[in-house]
């Protein structure tokens, strides 16, 4: 074996790709699979999904007739309709022949159901792609066999990884236009596995496909590619696993307090993680009050349990102060509360993310003020994080978040609902970023500047200690102290004086 061949073999062992016959031994996950197609411009994402819909009989008769009519004059050399038209819903998309918005479609086989998001390939629509990736379990990354990996391909793979996706299918599309060149397929597969390894992704399956002809999409392409004996795309999707929200304890972000009468008080929301049943002890955050679950109610039923994804009304065994935006959680597995967190985000607006600017942060139904300090920006070509004081639109960056009052999060790796957030510009109400929590930061306190004054957001006991000092009395014109939910006191007087 030559040195390059040996290196390739070692890499292929590091990045796991299970043959369908081995994967079939795993217990089948029958829950709906959410997937995203991504890649560079004109790699054939919409055509691939259109072909999936067509070959799984998910296209209704009126849609098929409309497709034939809209494809009039656009038929390819094979006389096939333009399957991408099944996805391109916006007039601008049809006129330009590109995808702009994120298009969601549902289809099913006799083994499983699927929700697929077709995302735009153009760089200026990277933010739309990030939206689609935020809820996906698996990414199908398309690459034009004639062109290979491009910067936008790497960008999409990186964003998908940052959004928590750990299962990738590399679809080397338009393989027919290379005369079904196996060497070309192997080269692209190896390059992507190197990229996947650098991103920490180990589960990659590479497939040579022709989306237009439908080869290796639903039906195998062995007649044209006898050298490929792996699974088709649909076989891989049927055996993929979904991300479970059971990895952390019970989470119920409170959306509404229900009081139809004086005898009933319930807390409504969608379970974001774990499970709950009557008798369980729970904690209300950020207050820290404890209660037991008395009853679980849905629209017309009293339930004996609820799990992630269920919309419920939770009744507790005692009167406690619970408001919209609070989180009800397992008492033995609580989310993290704090004034400072580390996060990664994607900038979504032309103004980008400015250093030290204060935004509204919204996570679930909780909305609070936060100061954002960019730390670094990802360079897509090298995969390195470079120092950054600000983040332009479409940039992927690491930031520090400093809150005025206690924030409640899991990390995004633990829970994609309670670990995700958006940033809103208070001046324009535009959503300027979508992000995910990576860790809690050790913090002195919530400290930020407003014009010429320093604002300290501190636990109430520490705030009282500080305001009783001579140092604070001498700096009263320059410093304002705001009380927040009680927490562990930290000695910051020396830091203020410095």
Swiss-Prot record:
Chain sites annotated for binding GTP: 39-46, 118-122, 173-176
Gene name of this polypeptide: cysN
Highest taxon of source: Bacteria
Region (G1): 39-46
Region spans: G2: 97-101
Pathway the protein contributes to: Sulfur metabolism; hydrogen sulfide biosynthesis; sulfite from sulfate: step 1/3
Role of this protein: With CysD forms the ATP sulfurylase (ATPS) that catalyzes the adenylation of sulfate producing adenosine 5'-phosphosulfate (APS) and diphosphate, the first enzymatic step in sulfur assimilation pathway. APS synthesis involves the formation of a high-energy phosphoric-sulfuric acid anhydride bond driven by GTP hydrolysis by CysN coupled to ATP hydrolysis by CysD.
Higher taxonomy: Bacteria, Pseudomonadati, Pseudomonadota, Alphaproteobacteria, Hyphomicrobiales
Claim: Nucleotide-binding is one of the keywords in the record: yes
Chain positions covered by the region annotation G5: 210-212
Family assignment from sequence similarity: Belongs to the TRAFAC class translation factor GTPase superfamily. Classic translation factor GTPase family. CysN/NodQ subfamily.
GO terms of biological process kind: hydrogen sulfide biosynthetic process; sulfate assimilation
UniProt-listed InterPro entries: CysN_GTP-bd (IPR041757), CysN_II (IPR044138), CysN_NoDQ_III (IPR044139), G_TR_CS (IPR031157), GTP-eEF1A_C (IPR054696), P-loop_NTPase (IPR027417), SO4_adenylTrfase_lsu (IPR011779), T_Tr_GTP-bd_dom (IPR000795)
Top EC category: transferase
NCBIfam families hit by this protein: CysN, PRK05124.1
Residue span of region G3: 118-121
GO MF annotation, one: sulfate adenylyltransferase (ATP) activity
Entry-linked Pfam families: GTP-eEF1A_C, GTP_EFTU
Reactions that this protein is recorded to catalyse: sulfate + ATP + H(+) = adenosine 5'-phosphosulfate + diphosphate
Protein name, per record: Sulfate adenylyltransferase subunit 1
Oligomer and partners: Heterodimer composed of CysD, the smaller subunit, and CysN.
EC code(s) of this entry: 2.7.7.4
Native source organism of the sequence: Rhizobium meliloti (strain 1021) (Ensifer meliloti)
Keywords: ATP-binding, GTP-binding, Nucleotide-binding, Nucleotidyltransferase, Transferase
Region ranges (G4): 173-176
